[in-house]
């Protein structure tokens, strides 16, 4: 009986603490930390095969399918911008609580270039949404 209880405890514990794969789940709303791309990534290839350009309003996220449009709102100042997800983040960034890595243009609009990180809300929006 003790062995059965121990085995049951191990199974339940391992499933409760197992890491969930969130790659491309397309959540409607998500909260977390945003960062922005380093300048040395300019013109590098993204997960969609296109080149990353700091002047475009794009982002990398493991929580949305590629080519999903999301409104990103900086919770510290209320500014928002709509970006298209065209890349994936390194898993180590997601492990640090980051939900999106934005282009430099998007980070400028949101007003967190100096701090480098900010708390954000992400909301999935229809393709082509401007605001």
Go through the PLM ranges and name each one:
Residues 4-13:
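Sec-dependent N-terminal signal peptides
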Residues 1-4, 19:
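Positively charged n-region of N-terminal signal peptides that target proteins for export
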Residues 18-131:
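Secreted/periplasmic proteins
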């Amino acid at each position: 009986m003790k062995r059965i209880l121990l085995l049951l405890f191990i199974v339940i514990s391992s499933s409760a603490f197992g890491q969930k794969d969130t790659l491309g789940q397309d959540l409607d709303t998500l909260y977390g930390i945003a960062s922005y791309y380093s300048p040395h990534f300019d013109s590098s290839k993204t997960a969609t095969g296109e080149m990353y350009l700091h002047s475009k309003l794009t982002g990398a996220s493991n929580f949305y399918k590629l080519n999903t449009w999301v409104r990103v709102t900086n919770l510290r100042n209320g500014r928002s911008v709509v970006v298209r997800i065209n890349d994936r983040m390194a898993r180590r960034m997601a492990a640090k609580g980051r939900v999106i890595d934005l282009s430099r243009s998007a980070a400028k609009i949101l007003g967190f270039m100096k701090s480098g990180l900010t708390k954000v809300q992400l909301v999935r929006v229809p393709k082509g949404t401007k605001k």
